[in-house]
From Swiss-Prot:
Subunit and interaction comment: The glycine cleavage system is composed of four proteins: P, T, L and H.
Source species: Thermosynechococcus vestitus (strain NIES-2133 / IAM M-273 / BP-1)
A GO biological process held by the record: glycine decarboxylation via glycine cleavage system
Cellular component aspect of the GO annotation: cytosol; glycine cleavage complex
Cofactor binding note: Binds 1 lipoyl cofactor covalently.
Domain of life: Bacteria
Protein name: Glycine cleavage system H protein
Entry keywords, A to Z: Lipoyl
Gene behind this protein: gcvH
Listed cofactors: (R)-lipoate
Amino acid sequence: MTLTYPEDLQYLDSHEYLRLEGDTATLGISAFAVDQLGDIVFVELPAVGDALEPGERFGTIESVKAVEDLYAPLGGTVIAVNQAVIDNPEQIAADPYGEGWLVKVQVSTLPTGLLSAADYRALVEGS
């Protein structure tokens, strides 16, 4: 299977992506992360109104292979949570960059160390 990394997103070496639109960021996990996790069976996400701090844990993704903590790449306030992925975690694998997003955040602290799609592809493909 060919993994895709949309050019309009920014990536982190921890395999999250973010879509910045003004001062709002949509966070999710990359196709590479989905591929490594396997079948996702449970997702725990913060509540709307929760504050995120860079580097702090904000949720968990559980698969048949592993339980992985999610760490905030930025600071801000959660303004939306994707209830669809909580109810149906497999939605993350079906469409990680679309309907499989995790949270939307009103950004107060921008992340550092963001990678372009090309740089992220090179990282995960070992080039």
